[in-house]
Regions:
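Non-heme Fe(II)/2-oxoglutarate
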Residues: 2-95, 116
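Catalytic core of non-heme Fe(II) oxygenases with the double-stranded beta-helix
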Residues: 62, 66-77, 81-174
Length: 177
């Protein structure tokens, strides 16, 4: 049997910026201010963003960051190490062949009313993540939540595992790409 990542939902990891910075509220506000300077596009073609803005994919926000974004890159690298250590004893190729080189690619998404991300994968990545700088209050219908499932446009199984996570400001959510 192929044993790359038998149950990807089991490899989710949730942390928060508050475990990396003293004043996470001020830090998040600073990151948001820096991101306001980044050029974005409304509903970029071929991307998962619906009713929202996304930075240009030609611009990797983590390539040569400065200021708060440089600190954010450092936080991400540290949290990837925490992630790996958490799962290092798992007997699957996803962990046993976990890349030792940290090649990060980052972008920003700003969702507006009724905005969301369509279901998608990051086929060129190994580990993906989201850092929540702003969230909407949940009104009982999973507003602002992130969902995980093995189902897709081309595959659907009602018995397939799924998980919905309601993030809070500062949450870092890692999951297999």
């Amino acid at each position: 049997a192929y044993n790359f990542c038998p149950n990807p939902i089991n490899f989710m990891h949730i942390a928060n910026l508050s475990s990396h910075v003293i004043d996470s509220v001020a830090y998040v506000e600073g990151v948001i201010e820096e991101l306001k300077k980044i050029k974005t596009v409304w509903e970029p073609p071929g991307k998962a963003t619906v009713s929202g803005f996304q930075s240009l994919m030609s611009m990797n926000l983590l390539k040569n960051p400065s200021g708060k974004l440089a600190q954010l890159k450092s936080i991400i690298i540290n949290e990837i190490e925490v992630y790996y250590l958490k799962f290092q004893n798992e007997q699957c190729s996803y962990i046993q062949k976990f890349p030792t080189t940290r090649n990060l690619f980052g972008w920003t998404v700003i969702l507006k009313q009724q905005g969301h991300q369509n279901a998608h994968i990051h086929s060129s990545g190994w580990l993906s993540g989201v850092i929540y700088l702003k969230v909407v209050p949940p009104l009982g219908k999973d507003e602002g939540a992130i969902g995980f499932s093995l189902n897709s446009e081309y595959y659907h199984d009602v018995n397939s595992p799924s998980l919905t996570f309601q993030p809070e400001v500062g949450d870092i959510v890692f999951f297999p790409s």
